[in-house]
């Protein structure tokens, strides 16, 4: 099988267990073990690349990070998962993008990017992408996060267009918030990406409604799916819904104890892509994606996606 090309963000996540620290401070107790700030490999598309690789499919990652200790950590992290990093470039002029992830008492996160704009991940250029890339890949996965700034935005949109014209499936994780629409160029790029995608994935709370310009998640998904695009709405403990044309499929979530939600959507994306490339139906692919996400949230770290053996074992004893 030809590899999946994952083009997009890669960063170092600094996970800050604020709720644990605040509780300890309020009670006058010592911080529990394992409650320190942790630096881990992150980036939504990089996480998805690792999720696909752990499920046994070949993966090629294209992106940019700083030529520093964090950048080396990120490259080594991808290679440890057997992700091909030949299209990962070090930018000597920028430090590696950092994301501060502050966790509350439920494991939900609030993210702060550092820097907020013009980070290393937006430095990817068209010349990083080989001229024959269309002949070398089976699927392209991208994110809305890269559409904020050039050269990343134009590089991604051009590759999406080329893949669409040549029959290579394109999946697009929206992965932006409402403030994106305050930037006319960013908003325009999102609309372009919407028309170039075969599969659109996003959260029910904000991402799918934002992309469709419709506040109700179901109406938003239906409008995006009218032209035959597959639209997948992730909704946490409720599960996920798939829309395509007039078809709707619901896949319930698996019940697990939530430890950390970081990377759950990225894991879902990777498992869905892997399942479809392995020939599973949309319904079965959604079930596998929900199972993979459930395993992810029961662990700690954005790279908590399961291996093929772990996913199969979990599915053998479902707890939906």
What are the roles of these predicted feature ranges?
Residues 1-64, 69-83, 257-259:
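Glycine-rich phosphate/adenosyl-contacting loop at the front of the ribokinase-like
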Residues 59, 85, 170-171, 201, ...:
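Hydrophobic beta-strand scaffold residues
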Residues 131-135, 193-194, 225:
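A short, aliphatic-rich alpha-helical micro-motif
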Residues 139-222, 238-240:
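Conserved beta-alpha-beta core of the PfkB/ribokinase-like small-molecule kinase fold
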């Amino acid at each position: 099988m030809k590899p999946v090309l994952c083009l997009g963000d890669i960063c170092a996540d600094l996970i800050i267990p604020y709720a644990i620290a605040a509780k300890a401070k309020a009670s006058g107790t010592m911080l529990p073990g394992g409650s320190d700030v942790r630096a881990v490999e992150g980036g939504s598309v990089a996480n998805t690349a690792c999720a696909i690789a752990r499920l046994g499919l070949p993966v090629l990652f294209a992106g940019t990070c700083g030529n520093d200790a964090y950048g080396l950590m990120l490259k080594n992290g991808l290679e440890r998962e057997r992700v091909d990093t030949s299209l990962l470039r070090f930018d000597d002029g920028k430090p590696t993008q950092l994301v501060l992830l502050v966790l509350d008492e439920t494991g939900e996160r609030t993210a702060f990017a550092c820097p907020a704009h013009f980070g290393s991940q937006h430095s990817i250029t068209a010349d990083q992408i080989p001229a024959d890339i269309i002949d070398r890949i089976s699927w392209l996965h991208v994110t809305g996060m890269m559409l904020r700034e050039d050269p990343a935005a134009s590089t991604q949109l051009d590759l999406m267009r080329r893949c669409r014209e040549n029959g290579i499936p394109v999946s697009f994780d929206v992965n932006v918030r409402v403030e994106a629409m305050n930037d006319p160029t960013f908003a325009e790029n999102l609309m372009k990406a919407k028309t170039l995608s075969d599969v659109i994935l996003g959260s029910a709370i904000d991402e799918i409604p934002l992309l469709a310009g419709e506040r109700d998640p179901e109406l938003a998904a239906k409008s995006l799916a009218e032209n035959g695009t597959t639209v997948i709405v992730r909704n946490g403990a409720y599960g996920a819904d798939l829309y395509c044309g007039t078809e709707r499929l619901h896949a319930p979530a698996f019940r697990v104890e939530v430890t950390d939600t970081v990377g759950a959507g990225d894991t879902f994306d990777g498992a869905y892509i892997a399942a479809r490339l392995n020939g599973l139906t949309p319904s079965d692919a959604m079930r596998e994606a929900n199972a993979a996400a459930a395993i992810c949230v029961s662990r700690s770290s954005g790279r908590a996606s399961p291996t093929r053996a772990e996913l199969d074992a979990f599915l053998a004893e479902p707890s939906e």
